[in-house]
Amino acid sequence: MHTIYSENWKDYELVDAGNGKKLERWGNTFTIRPDRNAYFHTVLSEDEWRNKVDFEFIENTSTSGEWVQRNSEAENEWQIKYGKAIFNIKLTKFKHVGLFPEQQTNWDFIQNKVQKEHKLLNLFGYTGASSV
């Protein structure tokens, strides 16, 4: 078996996770989103999370909710970079931001395997990031 893992990404960081949520940094913007896989305890305190967060997603149902702005100066749309790619980040009512950072290893794999003279049609790319 070959293990693939993500290298450091300057504009994204999973800062902490636990108690059913994850604290993420997208460029200079911090978000809290529910995550049922975060069933363990956080490393950082609740106060540390609150001092960092710009937006928190509050679920209304299992399929929708709303973002609550915790920092009045934060903008609800911004950009981040990965390599030469620039991604537009926007808060959605489905708790997503338009990009799935866990796909980074797939982007690297595709970039390493597909040469410039090849054309790629990604029929399964929810955000389109793998097609960039």
Where are these regions (language model features)?
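N-terminal accessory targeting/assembly segments
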Residues: 1-6
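Non-catalytic substrate-recognition/targeting regions of SAM-dependent transferases
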Residues: 8-25, 31-101, 108
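Functionally constrained cores in energy, signaling, and assembly domains
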Residues: 26-29, 107, 125, 132
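Conserved alpha-helix/loop element of class I SAM-dependent methyltransferases that forms part
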Residues: 101-117
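Conserved SAM/SAH cofactor-binding pocket of Class I
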Residues: 112-132
